[in-house]
C-alpha cells in the first residue's frame, strides 16, 4: 500500500470511497433476535449507581486535596482525582454519546456534556466523529479517530500518556470552533445543521476554562486548575493506556471487527474506569448493547472471536512488537487467530488493499 495518508482530503480517503470500502457490509456474529433484544435492553440503575460513585469519589478526593494543599499528603488525592477526571470521563463521554448508558435520555445527555467538557472534546463535533469511527472503523482517510497511525510516532504516544498532544490540538480547535465554527476537517463529518451548536458548545467551554484561569490568577494559586483543566493532563494515562489497546497493531481497511479490534480482560478497577470498553470487539460489532451487558455478550459470542488478551500487560506485550515493526513496514499488522468454532475471516477481502488490487469478491 505504501505510505498512508490519513487526511480526509487525500488519496486514501478517495480510494476507500471508490473501492466500495466505505459502503461495505461489516461482519457480525449471529445472535438470536430474542437474545439480542434482551442484551440491548436499557436500564438507569447500573449507570446511576456508577455515576453517583464516580462523582462522589471525585468530590471526596477534591475536598481531600484542597484540605491538604501545600503538603505532600495532597499528592495521592490529586493523583486519584486526576484518573477519574482525565480517564473515566473518556468512557462516560463514549457510552453516553451512544445513548446506551442510561435508559433516560436526559441523563445520557447531561453526563455526555459534563464528560465532554472534562475530556476536552466539543460535544457536537465528537458525536459525529465517533459515529464515523463506528461506521468506517480504521479505514484510512475516513476514520477521524485513528489513535495509532502508521508508522507509529512513539514519542507522541508516550507524551500523550500525559495528554500533551490532545491538549495542544484541543486549544486551537476550541478557539476556532468558538469564533468560526467547525474546522475544514470537521465539516467532512459534522452535518451543516449542527455547525451552530459546535460554536455554542465551544463558547461555553472557553468561558469555563477562562473563568478557572481567572480564579487561579486571583487566588495566586494553581489550585482551581487542579480541579478543572490540569487533571486532563496528569490523569490521562489510564484512558490512553486502554485506548491504545483498542486497535493498536491490528489491521486497517477491513470490514471485520475481529481483525481490527481487541478484547482484553481487565481488573475491576480498570473496568470501572473504562466502563467495560475492554470488551471492544463486542462493542464495535454491537454498539447498541449497553456497557453493563457487554460481559454477557462476550460470553455468548466468544466462540466466534479471537481469544481475548488475558491482561493489560499481555495485550501490550502483543501490541508493542507490532508497533515497532510498523516503523519499518507500514503494511505489517497482527492477524488474530480464530478458534475452530468461529466463522473464518473473508480472506478475499482482507487481503485487499485499496488502490493496489481489486477484491476478488468484486470481480
Mark where each language-model region is.
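Histidine-centered catalytic micro-motifs
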Residues: 89-99, 126-138, 242-249, 273-289
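Membrane-embedded alpha-helical segments that form the functional core of polytopic membrane enzymes
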Residues: 67-93, 110, 114-124, 229-236, ...
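Active-site-flanking alpha-helical
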Residues: 61, 97, 101-102, 254, ...
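Transmembrane alpha-helical segments that form the membrane-embedded catalytic/substrate-channel core
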Residues: 83-93, 122, 167-173, 227-255, ...
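Short acidic-hydrophobic sequence patches enriched in Asp/Glu that either
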Residues: 46, 102-110, 125, 229, ...
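Aspartate-rich (DDxxD/NDxxD/DxxxD) Mg2+/diphosphate-binding motifs
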Residues: 91-110, 138-146
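Active-site-proximal inter-transmembrane loops
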Residues: 185-193, 257-279
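Non-catalytic, topology-defining segments of multipass membrane proteins
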Residues: 1-82, 92, 117-225, 291-363
Amino acid at each position: 500500500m505504501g505510505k498512508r495518508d490519513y487526511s480526509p482530503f487525500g488519496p486514501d480517503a478517495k480510494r476507500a470511497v471508490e473501492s466500495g470500502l466505505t459502503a461495505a457490509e461489516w461482519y457480525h456474529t449471529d445472535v438470536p433476535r430474542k437474545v439480542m433484544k434482551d442484551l440491548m435492553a436499557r436500564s438507569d440503575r447500573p449507570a446511576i449507581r456508577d455515576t453517583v460513585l464516580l462523582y462522589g469519589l471525585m468530590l471526596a478526593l477534591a475536598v481531600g486535596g484542597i484540605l491538604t494543599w501545600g503538603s505532600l499528603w495532597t499528592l495521592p488525592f490529586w493523583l486519584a482525582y486526576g484518573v477519574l477526571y482525565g480517564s473515566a470521563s473518556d468512557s462516560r463521554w463514549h457510552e453516553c454519546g451512544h445513548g446506551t448508558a442510561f435508559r433516560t435520555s436526559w441523563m445520557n445527555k447531561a453526563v455526555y456534556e459534563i464528560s465532554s467538557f472534562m475530556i476536552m472534546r466539543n460535544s457536537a463535533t465528537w458525536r459525529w466523529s465517533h459515529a464515523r469511527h463506528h461506521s468506517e472503523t480504521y479505514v484510512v482517510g475516513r476514520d477521524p479517530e485513528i489513535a495509532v497511525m502508521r508508522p507509529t510516532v512513539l514519542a507522541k504516544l508516550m507524551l500523550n500518556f500525559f495528554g500533551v498532544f490532545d491538549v495542544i490540538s484541543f486549544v486551537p480547535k476550541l478557539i476556532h470552533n468558538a469564533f468560526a465554527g467547525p474546522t475544514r476537517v470537521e465539516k467532512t463529518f459534522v452535518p451543516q445543521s449542527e455547525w451552530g451548536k459546535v460554536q455554542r458548545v465551544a463558547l461555553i467551554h472557553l468561558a469555563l476554562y477562562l473563568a478557572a484561569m481567572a480564579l487561579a490568577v486571583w487566588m495566586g494559586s494553581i489550585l482551581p486548575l487542579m480541579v478543572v483543566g490540569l487533571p486532563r493532563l496528569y490523569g490521562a494515562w489510564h484512558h490512553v493506556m486502554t485506548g491504545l489497546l483498542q486497535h493498536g497493531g491490528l489491521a486497517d481497511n477491513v470490514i471485520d471487527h475481529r481483525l481490527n479490534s481487541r478484547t482484553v480482560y481487565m481488573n475491576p478497577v480498570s473496568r470501572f474506569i473504562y466502563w467495560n470498553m475492554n470488551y471492544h470487539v463486542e462493542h464495535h460489532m454491537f454498539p447498541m448493547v449497553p456497557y453493563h451487558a457487554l460481559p454477557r455478550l462476550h460470553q455468548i459470542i466468544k466462540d466466534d472471536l479471537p481469544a481475548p488478551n488475558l491482561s493489560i500487560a499481555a495485550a501490550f506485550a502483543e501490541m508493542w512488537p507490532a508497533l515497532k515493526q510498523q516503523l519499518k513496514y507500514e503494511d505489517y499488522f497482527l492477524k488474530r487467530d480464530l478458534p475452530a468454532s468461529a466463522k473464518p475471516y473473508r480472506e478475499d477481502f482482507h487481503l485487499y488493499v485499496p488502490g493496489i488490487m481489486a477484491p476478488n469478491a468484486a470481480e
